[in-house]
């Protein structure tokens, strides 16, 4: 250990210094002698004095050491000192620690930190493991963890059962072109695109079920809102109708946003004073059918990338989804509903009034585009077989899933929420890669 010259014995460490977690130190500890551990966040020195911030568990404390010592960012320290009133007129901290002694863990001063405020996005991602040591990036961990807990709490309050489905599968849900294929012993298998089918098997027993798990899409999409591996919040509800499904997702989204900002809003404002937090959306969300959305874009003079009009049958890209939120939704989320059968997978229930459409929806969020997709599910055996044939799938591969339409079927539906997209919206991130720990996409699979 590197010690300041006053011995531990002389300081009577055991008797005089209260060992306390840095995150628990408060103004109520004023004038107390404390021992705590943390990492140097920043440091500046004078002729015979050192000022540094020590950080741990998303909290920092100001420290004053009446000796000159060169400390670098990320150096691990145990300090012994006294809590006193902050004497700096430039700092707004309520208190500071007058350090009487410090220990440098393993006698190791950290090397020069490779990141700063001017670092590019790619450099930040390259050093993602160190970027976490910066306050804003490190706070992402707390934000993500908090939002996950909030979502779980809401499901728990709604009597949902959480399941942990497999992620190695032999069936597809969202189309074969986006599957990651692998060898599973002597058979072909895939990384899951969605856990929906497994949730459907649970719904007749649990009535309400959800999972929060990784899903994988082999899409070569080089955008700010796509990941190859993402956190998928999926739910399935038995004995419901389309309106019930819509109400459930509206409740989940609005309540998640409210609780998230109630919990972390002040901290976010302190870290990002330049951004404006999202408002909690008003319910019910505005709705527009897919065919009407096509007409709306044309009426607004919004063209496709090739400068032609949209026609029924076209996919609506995320850039135009944002326009729908801005102009039709007036800056609020919009539910786009009743997509064409050929747009959606085999399992979606047909609209009873128009069987060219499905009882489906995408939730479009301002500034992001789609963050949730959902539908009522087919519950008729013969119509499921028709769906498999339409998409060129072998029903024998889905024999277990077809049993759901034979053994006690009911009207049921569900949805999948892209967790990182929601977090991206709430934290006002400019890139979805900020919403996950170590992004996986066409550019990154390291570390």
Curated annotation (Swiss-Prot):
Q: GO cellular component terms?
A: cytoplasm
GO biological process terms held by the UniProt record = asparaginyl-tRNA aminoacylation
Q: Name one Pfam family in it.
A: tRNA-synt_2
Enzyme Commission number(s): 6.1.1.22
The entry lists its GO molecular-function terms as: asparagine-tRNA ligase activity; ATP binding
> Out of the domains of life, which is the source?
Eukaryota
Q: Which reaction does it catalyse?
A: tRNA(Asn) + L-asparagine + ATP = L-asparaginyl-tRNA(Asn) + AMP + diphosphate + H(+)
| Top-level enzyme category | ligase
Q: PROSITE patterns in the record, alphabetically?
A: AA_TRNA_LIGASE_II
**Major location, coarse class?**
cytoplasm
Task: List locations, semicolon-separated.
Answer: Cytoplasm
Q: Does the keyword Cytoplasm apply?
A: yes
Which keywords accompany this UniProt record? Aminoacyl-tRNA synthetase, ATP-binding, Cytoplasm, Ligase, Nucleotide-binding, Protein biosynthesis
The family note in this entry says: Belongs to the class-II aminoacyl-tRNA synthetase family.
Protein name, UniProt field = Probable asparagine--tRNA ligase, cytoplasmic
């Amino acid at each position: 250990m590197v010690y300041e010259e006053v011995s531990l014995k002389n300081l009577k460490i055991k008797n005089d210094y209260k060992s306390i977690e840095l995150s628990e130190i408060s103004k109520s500890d004023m004038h107390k002698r404390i021992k705590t551990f943390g990492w140097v966040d920043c440091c500046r020195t004078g002729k015979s004095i050192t000022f540094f911030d020590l950080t741990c568990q998303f909290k920092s404390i100001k420290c004053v050491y009446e000796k000159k010592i060169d400390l670098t960012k990320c150096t691990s320290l145990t300090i012994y000192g006294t809590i006193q009133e902050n004497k700096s007129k430039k700092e707004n901290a309520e208190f500071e620690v007058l350090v009487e002694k410090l220990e440098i863990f393993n006698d190791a001063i950290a090397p020069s930190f490779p990141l700063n405020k001017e670092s590019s996005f790619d450099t930040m991602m390259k050093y993602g493991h160190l970027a976490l040591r910066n306050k804003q990036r490190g706070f992402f961990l707390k934000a993500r963890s908090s939002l996950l807990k909030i979502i779980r709490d809401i499901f728990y309050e709604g009597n949902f059962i959480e399941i942990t489905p497999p992620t190695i599968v032999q069936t597809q849900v969202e189309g074969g072109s986006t599957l990651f294929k692998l060898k599973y012993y002597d058979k072909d298998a895939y990384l899951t695109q969605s856990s929906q089918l497994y949730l459907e098997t649970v719904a007749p027993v649990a009535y309400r079920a959800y999972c929060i798990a990784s899903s994988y899409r082999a899409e070569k999409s080089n955008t700010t809102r796509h990941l190859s591996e993402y956190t998928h919040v999926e739910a399935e509800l038995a004995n419901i109708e389309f309106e019930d499904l819509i109400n459930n997702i509206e409740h989940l989204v609005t309540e998640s946003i409210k609780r998230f900002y109630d919990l972390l809003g002040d901290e976010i404002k302190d870290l990002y004073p330049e951004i404006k937090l999202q408002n909690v959306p008003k319910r019910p969300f505005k709705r527009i059918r897919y065919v009407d959305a096509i007409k709306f874009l044309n009426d607004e003079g919004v063209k496709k990338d090739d400068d032609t009009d949209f026609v029924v049958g076209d996919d609506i890209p995320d850039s135009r989804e944002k326009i729908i939120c801005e102009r039709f939704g007036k800056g609020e989320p919009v539910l786009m509903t009743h997509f064409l059968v050929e747009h959606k997978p085999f399992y979606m229930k047909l609209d009873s009034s128009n069987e060219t459409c499905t009882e489906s929806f995408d939730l479009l969020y301002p500034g992001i585009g789609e963050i949730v997709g959902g539908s009522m599910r087919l519950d008729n055996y013969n119509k499921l077989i028709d769906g498999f044939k339409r998409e060129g799938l072998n029903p024998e591969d889905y024999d277990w899933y077809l049993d759901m339409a034979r053994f006690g079927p009911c009207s049921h539906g569900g949805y999948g929420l892209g967790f990182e997209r929601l977090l991206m919206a709430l934290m006002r991130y400019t890139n979805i890669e900020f919403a996950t720990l170590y992004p996986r996409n066409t550019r990154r699979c390291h570390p």
